[in-house]
Amino acid sequence: TNLKLRASYGKVGNDKLGATRFLYISNISTGGGVIPSLGRGQAINQGKLGNPNLGWEIAYKQNYGIDVQLFRELSLTVDYFREKREDVLISRGTVPEIQGVALGNLPKVNMGRIDNHGFEFEATYNKRIDKDWSFTVKGNFAYNKNTQRFMDEAQKPADYVYRYRSTGYSIGQNFGYRIDYSNGNGYINTQEELDKALATYQVGGTPRMGDFLYVDLNEDGIIDEKDQAPIKYSDIPRITYGFSGSVNWKNFDFSFLFSGIAKASRLYAGWGATEFANVGFFSDYHLQAWTPERFANGEEILYPALGSAPGTSQKPNDFFIMDRSFLRLKNIELGYTLPKGLLKKVGINSTRIYVNGNNLLTWKAMKTDVIDPEQGSDLNYPITKMVNFGINVTF
């Protein structure tokens, strides 16, 4: 049995400032055709300005932890951390365009500030019951939240319900339209609702029967980008967790591993999410799209009215910004080791026969099975289920 307390504080630098290199050098570009007054040369345009004063991002890190081991069987580890990142490399957002340089050509600067905090917990229990039986179980849980304190972001006008898109929010926070479920299902079901939408929607496209109803958050009688609000979370999971275990009985062994995430969201707008992406991709929940007949019959509706092109329903909203929380059985394996007495006669030291599976079960919050919550893009190769049979022989 032992107990260990840990604490640390440090100031560190981060030189991983993105893929763009040589930000301290100004660029110029040529083009635009031949100009006679320049001796038939080409025009020279100012490109991105360099910043010779760039430096590393600085992070102030704190960590406090405790390690406990009891009776050589149970071990616990708990950590709490805080991090303040300063001089984060960002693009200026509050410089007026009338200064003469296109905003996209302004140099990057060390001005951003981001805070992180969270905790991690891990527990392991090992037990040998007798000479034949033993088992191990292990679990972990982590919570992490980041907040962008300063990103030199220009404040939007006062008639925007939410005047910032970065400042005060987590990195990658999703914004979109909130669906109005006050009529029971959140769709335009009646001619009266359609007439109102036609008079108020300025989101791009023309609303139709079966499209989403949006909430006029600033109550100005118009549905437009001023009504966009933070939706769910960012793509970075706030919670990650997992648990695993193994059991041994005589010559048999069994193991499993589960992992999952929670409080993570992503905007899906490509293959599998919409019915018209990449010349058409009909998915499972499109079978339960809104139609007048389905609505009149009181059937379950899981998707807005189908179309051949993006409309008002395909804007960022709390339908297409999906909760990608999931719990997945990453691996499970059963094995048997043949008795050594049978093998020595043929010169074999050990033989183990096994069967295992990967990604066999997934529990997720999404309403469609076509999109996998672990994929970074709709075009990535999908996560596959696999079952393997094998034999390990040692001579």
What are the functions of these language-model segments?
Residues 1-171, 316, 321-395:
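Extracellular/periplasmic, surface-exposed regions of secreted and cell-surface proteins
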Residues 36-43, 90-93, 118, 215-223, ...:
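Active-site-adjacent bridging/hinge elements
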Residues 106-115, 157-174, 230-242, 246, ...:
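C-terminal extracellular loops and terminal segments
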Residues 261-352, 357:
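Extracytoplasmic gating/loop element in the C-terminal half of outer-membrane beta-barrel translocons
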Residues 109, 126-235:
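Conserved small-residue
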Residues 95-109, 158-165, 173-178, 229, ...:
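Surface-exposed, low-complexity loop segments enriched in small/polar and acidic residues
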